[in-house]
Amino acid sequence: MPVSPSSVSVLPPTSLEQILRIRAERNQRTPKCARCRNHGTTSALKGHKRYCQWKDCMCAKCTLIAERQRVMAAQVALRRQQSQEERDARDLEVLLGSAGNANDLLDILRLDAGEHHGKNHASPTTNNNNNTEEKYEDSQGQRSSPSSPTGSETVVSTSSPPELSSESTPNTSGSVIPTSPVFKPNGYSSMPMFNPVYGRPFMRFPMFSVMPHFFGTPSMSDFASAASLAAPPAFFSAQPTIATSSPSTIFPQTAPLDYSHRLMKNEEAEEEYRENDKTF
């Protein structure tokens, strides 16, 4: 009994190829592998590109397909670039308010980016040479005139305090030697240290005769008001004031008088001066 074609189509598929063929017939827009089609077979492209048995074929048809795919990919990349440039131009039009200026600015930015990229590739050797020349010039200037600051040292911010000057920065050379035995910031007078720990020499041994330059800190003269604290160091005595209230030959008192003793001494001097005025 002959089987009609209508009954064949009604029969369920018996193999995977029939199932794939039926699905391909139902959905005609499913992309197919072009290499497999060139070689007489039909296979869906989804998930098939890696496992295609003709993916490395170098025949004329497959080579033409590969070239066509390359051209299409380049066209897609070009369209994406053009659309991105159009979006940038629209954004610049919103900012600048004119289409011509936006396009010109896009061209200028593109040219500047290309020139900057080329300079970055060509400039490392020149930058290194310039840096070495500048370092050599700075070292020569510091050797010739240690007391005169170089160009990099003279740039000091106006908002910074005087103690952050170029002489106290760690970048300066070691040939710059401070004039005073104990380093003091420029612009400030030497203030007294009322803390006995800082006002005494090491271990309180009589070392003034051995190393007088270590204890050459000028002491404060007698003062009665806070305004005399700002007096310049020229009015201070050169020798430190030594307390003799507890004399000792082994451990002499080498610390200067503290603030309270100075005030008491100053008050006694004022009373004596008033008494002398009354008598005269």
From Swiss-Prot:
Residues 157-173 have a biased composition (Low complexity). The keyword Ligase does not apply. Keywords: DNA-binding, Metal-binding, Nucleus, Transcription, Transcription regulation, Zinc. It comes from Caenorhabditis elegans. It is found in: Nucleus. Transcription factor. Required for sex-specific synaptic pruning, probably acting downstream of sex-determining transformer protein tra-1. Dimorphically expressed in the dimorphically connected interneuron AVG; expression is observed in the AVG in males, but not in hermaphrodites. One of its GO terms (molecular function) is RNA polymerase II cis-regulatory region sequence-specific DNA binding. The keyword Signal does not apply. Residues 33-80 bind DNA. Its main location: nucleus. InterPro entries: DM_DNA-bd, DM_DNA-bd_sf, DMRT. SMART domains: DM. This is Doublesex- and mab-3-related transcription factor dmd-5.
